[in-house]
C-alpha cells in the first residue's frame, strides 16, 4: 500500500481525494460488517477521514493500509 504521504497529498487532485477517502470508508465499513458491534458510530465518516489525516500528518512514512487497520482496531474498542 502507499504511504501516508500519498494520503496527505490526495487533496491536490479531486479524483485521487475521492478515491482514497472512498477506499478508507469502504475498508472501515467492511470491518464493521464483520464485527459484532457498530464501529462506525452511525456513519461519522468525517471523523474517520479526520483521524486518518492526523495519523498521516504525524507519521508520513506509515503505510495507509496499516494506518487503516489501526483505526479499525481503535474503533473496535
Where are these regions (language model features)?
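Short N-proximal segments of mature Sec-exported proteins
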Residues: 1-54
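Surface-exposed, polar helix/loop patches in the mature regions of secreted/periplasmic/lumenal proteins
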Residues: 45-77
Amino acid at each position: 500500500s502507499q504511504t501516508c504521504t500519498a494520503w496527505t497529498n490526495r487533496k491536490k487532485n479531486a479524483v485521487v481525494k475521492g478515491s482514497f477517502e472512498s477506499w478508507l470508508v469502504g475498508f472501515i465499513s467492511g470491518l464493521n460488517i464483520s464485527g459484532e458491534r457498530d464501529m462506525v458510530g452511525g456513519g461519522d465518516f468525517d471523523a474517520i477521514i479526520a483521524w486518518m489525516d492526523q495519523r498521516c500528518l504525524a507519521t508520513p512514512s506509515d503505510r495507509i493500509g496499516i494506518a487503516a487497520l489501526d483505526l479499525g482496531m481503535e474503533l473496535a474498542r
